[in-house]
Amino acid sequence: MVSSAQLDFNLQALLGQLSQDDLCKFKSLIRTVSLGNELQKIPQT
């Protein structure tokens, strides 16, 4: 996996360039991905 240092970008700077609408979409996507990861940790019965 490639680290953010190798990609040579600043996430905070990129987020600052997003419009408010894009920022809301990004946050929603992050929440969805995070929730999916949490659900994967729950053992299946």
Swiss-Prot record:
Protein name, entry field: NLR family pyrin domain-containing protein 2B
Keywords tagged on the record: Cytoplasm, Immunity, Innate immunity, Nucleus, Signal transduction inhibitor
Record's function text: May function as a negative regulator of NF-kappa-B by preventing RELA/p65 phosphorylation at 'Ser-536', thereby inhibiting its transcriptional activity. Through NF-kappa-B regulation may control cytokine release upon Toll-like receptors activation and therefore play a role in modulation of innate immunity. May also play a role in cell cycle progression and apoptotic process.
Predominant localisation class: cytoplasm
UniProt record, GO biological process: innate immune response; negative regulation of cell cycle; negative regulation of NF-kappaB transcription factor activity; negative regulation of peptidyl-serine phosphorylation; negative regulation of toll-like receptor signaling pathway; negative regulation of tumor necrosis factor-mediated signaling pathway; positive regulation of apoptotic process
The organism's place on the tree of life at top rank: Eukaryota
Tissues in which the UniProt entry reports expression: Expressed in all tissues tested, including spleen, lymph node, thymus, tonsil, peripheral blood leukocyte, bone marrow, liver, heart, brain, placenta, lung, skeletal muscle, kidney and pancreas.
Gene Ontology cellular component terms for the protein in this record: cytoplasm; nucleus
Induction cue: Up-regulated by inflammatory stimulus (LPS).
Cellular location(s): Cytoplasm; Nucleus
Top-level taxonomy: Eukaryota, Metazoa, Chordata, Craniata, Vertebrata
